[in-house]
Each structure stands twice: as structure tokens, then as C-alpha cells.
């Protein structure tokens, strides 16, 4: 991770350390983890894991997992290179899911606005179908782009 991002992670970690500790021992799924906001979250959670004995298991679904190839190996980070908007079955018991996968191209938004919305909504539908009976899942956060509005 570059120096600017690392410094941001240190600052955020120090400010929210106690809140982040509530995630210790939990499994978190992040879709769209290579995007601007969620990649910061992935880096922050990895930094948390460096500083704490009780780790957070981080699973990232994205079509651009190469973004994290410079991080090296971490047994608490699983990168899943796939398209969440396609029919897939998710089986891992997650405590939290943050769904932020979306098409990230203003040019594409303008040319194909419905496809932009479909990719985001279909991904959410796949998540909801996979976890509608989950007893471990505490929360799903759904993020979208302002471009779709």
C-alpha cells in the first residue's frame, strides 16, 4: 500500500480502534473492494489485522483483485475474482456484507444507464438470495453510485 494510504489507515485506526475491535473474529464480505472507497476499507482492515491478535477475516469479490497483488500473502484476506452480478452461490457464513460492486465508468453510465443499475441490483439480489436464511449475518450495507440517479 502506498505511503499516503498507509498514513490514512494509521490515522483512521487510531481514531476508531475501539469500534473496529467489535469486528475482531468476524468474517466480512466486501464486493467491489478494488473501488476507491472500499479499497480504503480493505487496507484499513488489513492494517487492523497487523495491530491485533484477534483478526478480521476479509473476503473481497471483485473483477480487479490484481489491485491487491502488491500486499503479499495474508491468511485473513481472500480475493475472489468474479462478477457478483452473475448467478453465483455464496456459502461462507459472513457476519457483515458490504456490497459496493458497480460499473465504475461515467462514460458507460451515460451510454448504458440501465446496465449500470442492473449490475448493482443483480449483485445485491445474488447476495440476498444466498443469505436470506442466514443466522450469522448481522448486517448488509448496500452502496450505489450517485451516477445512477
PLM regions with names:
Residues 84-119:
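NAD(P)H-binding glycine-rich loop region in Rossmannoid oxidoreductase-like domains
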Amino acid at each position: 500500500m502506498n505511503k499516503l494510504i498507509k498514513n490514512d489507515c494509521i490515522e483512521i485506526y487510531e481514531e476508531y480502534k475501539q469500534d473496529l475491535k467489535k469486528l475482531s473474529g468476524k468474517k466480512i464480505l466486501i464486493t467491489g473492494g478494488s473501488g476507491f472507497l472500499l479499497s480504503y476499507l480493505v487496507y484499513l482492515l488489513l492494517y487492523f489485522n497487523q495491530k491485533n491478535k484477534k483478526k478480521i477475516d476479509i473476503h473481497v469479490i471483485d473483477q480487479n483483485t490484481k489491485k491487491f497483488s502488491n500486499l503479499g500473502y495474508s491468511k485473513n484476506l481472500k480475493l475472489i475474482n468474479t462478477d457478483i452480478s452473475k448467478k453465483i452461490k455464496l456459502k461462507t457464513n459472513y457476519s457483515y456484507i458490504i456490497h459496493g460492486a458497480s460499473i465504475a465508468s461515467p462514460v458507460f453510465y451515460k451510454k448504458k444507464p440501465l446496465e449500470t443499475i442492473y449490475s448493482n441490483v443483480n449483485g445485491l439480489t445474488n447476495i440476498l438470495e444466498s443469505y436470506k436464511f442466514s443466522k450469522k449475518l448481522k448486517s448488509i450495507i448496500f452502496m450505489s453510485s450517485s451516477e445512477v440517479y
